[in-house]
């Protein structure tokens, strides 16, 4: 999406399953703040959360999947777990937690149907929230 204040934002809203998120996380060699959640597909999460634990510095869960994601993440030893009640709040929190060189990645591991009609709409909301944040400086 964009980079400002040396924090890079990536829109991977199309990542609607855990395998896609793992591939996205594997692509980065910098610290990642992961924004995940949405309509819960009720897939097993233990292996996924082990990858999240080793590939992220912070995790922000949102949407209807947030409760289950957080519960499994805690069980699997994931540290630095946060919650957001909206995309705008998730983007703002991701930026607040980031340091220069970090990545804020929207890669939900869920479908979008709890808050949005499709993954494209979710991705557009993410991009708009990032632009708003950038405009505020």
Indicate residue ranges for each PLM-predicted region.
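Glycine/aspartate-rich loop-and-adjacent alpha/beta segment that forms the canonical ThDP
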Residues: 109-136
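C-terminal helical cap/extension that packs against the catalytic core
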Residues: 46-102, 136-137
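Short glycine-rich anion-binding loops that position phosphate/pyrophosphate groups of nucleotides
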Residues: 38-41, 65, 103, 109-113
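Residue-level signal for inorganic ion chemistry
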Residues: 12, 34, 59, 106, ...
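Nucleotide phosphate-binding/pyrophosphate-handling subdomain across enzymes
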Residues: 1-56
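Alpha-helical scaffolding segments of alpha/beta enzyme cores, especially the outer helices
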Residues: 23, 47-50, 89, 121, ...
